[in-house]
Amino acid sequence: MAELATVARPYAEALYQVARQGDVAVWVEQVSALAQVAENAELRQFAGSPKVSAEQVYDVVAAAAGVSLSTGVQHFLRTVIDNGRLAVLPAIAVQFNALVNAASGVADAAIFSAYPIEPAQLAEVVAALEQRFGRKLSVNVTLEPELIGGIRVVVGDEVLDTSVKARLERMKVALSA
């Protein structure tokens, strides 16, 4: 995984340098769509076939993305395909999004909850978390029933775990000590 990140970094940085000259949000949408397509194992197998030209791979990926690609993103996709880096595209998208978020003062937050969170509750939780972490958060909520109750929040390398499972584990450690 580390080698994917190493290969992806220069692409993501170059992509960000070009994207910030225009509408970054459009670039994020298009690159995310391409990354989703590139995660498909059958597509990567097709792209790796020596019988398939780079132009054919480009046509299939661009069509499968389902969004109209700007000229800059088209050039980026051609470069990635020509360099045989289609499999790295999801990692490039992750690093590109991280650069965009860092520049705008936003951090990605993963919220794991035992139960579905209502939109009003989520808004309250996000407001409290933004105050606690001191920055705007882009939130992704995932259901994780094994937490029993409460939530676990991951922002960068910081973890805030208020789940029942974590409390029970702390009690177990305290009682066995």
UniProtKB/Swiss-Prot annotation:
Q: Which UniProt keywords apply?
A: ATP synthesis, Cell inner membrane, Cell membrane, CF(1), Hydrogen ion transport, Ion transport, Membrane, Transport
> Chief localization class?
membrane
* Gene3D superfamilies in the cross-refs: N-terminal domain of the delta subunit of the F1F0-ATP synthase (1.10.520.20)
Q: How does it sit in the membrane?
A: Peripheral membrane protein
Pfam families, per this entry? OSCP
Instruction: Write out the GO cellular component annotations.
Output: plasma membrane; proton-transporting ATP synthase complex
Description of how the protein assembles with itself and partners: F-type ATPases have 2 components, F(1) - the catalytic core - and F(0) - the membrane proton channel. F(1) has five subunits: alpha(3), beta(3), gamma(1), delta(1), epsilon(1). F(0) has three main subunits: a(1), b(2) and c(10-14). The alpha and beta chains form an alternating ring which encloses part of the gamma chain. F(1) is attached to F(0) by a central stalk formed by the gamma and epsilon chains, while a peripheral stalk is formed by the delta and b chains.
Protein family membership: Belongs to the ATPase delta chain family.
What function does the entry list?
A: F(1)F(0) ATP synthase produces ATP from ADP in the presence of a proton or sodium gradient. F-type ATPases consist of two structural domains, F(1) containing the extramembraneous catalytic core and F(0) containing the membrane proton channel, linked together by a central stalk and a peripheral stalk. During catalysis, ATP synthesis in the catalytic domain of F(1) is coupled via a rotary mechanism of the central stalk subunits to proton translocation. This protein is part of the stalk that links CF(0) to CF(1). It either transmits conformational changes from CF(0) to CF(1) or is implicated in proton conduction.
- Protein's name in the database: ATP synthase subunit delta
**Organism source for this protein?**
Leptothrix cholodnii (strain ATCC 51168 / LMG 8142 / SP-6) (Leptothrix discophora (strain SP-6))
